Amino acid sequence: SIAVSSAPIPTLDLLNLPRPKSSSPWAYVKIAEGCDRNCGFCAIPSFRGPQRSRDISSILDEVEQLEAQEIVLVAQDLASYGKDRPTELGAGSIVPLVRAVSATAAWTRLLYLYPSDLSDELIDAICDTGVPYFDLSLQHVSKPLLRRMRRWGDGERFLRRITDIRHREPSAAFRSNFIVGYPG
């Protein structure tokens, strides 16, 4: 006969695995996994599930342990960080985390921002990091096509926001990605 244990199966928290000190002057820090959006072209929610933000203290502990000069915060939807943790510091806003990381690291960079969630407060926090770098997932500028993609915003709104950022910080750098030939 086969003995089956009744002990609970341990869970593996892949977002909070300990990491060694960075051997590079930069380090990527994953602050959340998954996504709550249902863009028409994206499969991330189907295989990574809903957004799960890491606890701010575990992120700050990792940043300190890595001892990197530049910290690159990464998630599928950075601006939604914390919305799934409503009782924590700065609930529903990534701004307190950006400010806390910036107080520790010489430079802080954010990858993958949804342009419709780019608040004035977040723009100011990014400009204060030492790296005024805006990685905006624009995808397209046509409002009707963006609606078919199940995304919000439009080219005019995006350009106004970029112009506003340029007025605040003339040295700001931008990166984006665009989908051409969207079949939807």
Label the model's feature ranges:
Residues 1-82, 124, 130, 155-167:
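Proteins enriched for Cys/Gly/acidic motifs involved in redox and nucleic-acid/cofactor modification
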Residues 68-183:
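Conserved SAM/AdoMet-binding glycine-rich loop
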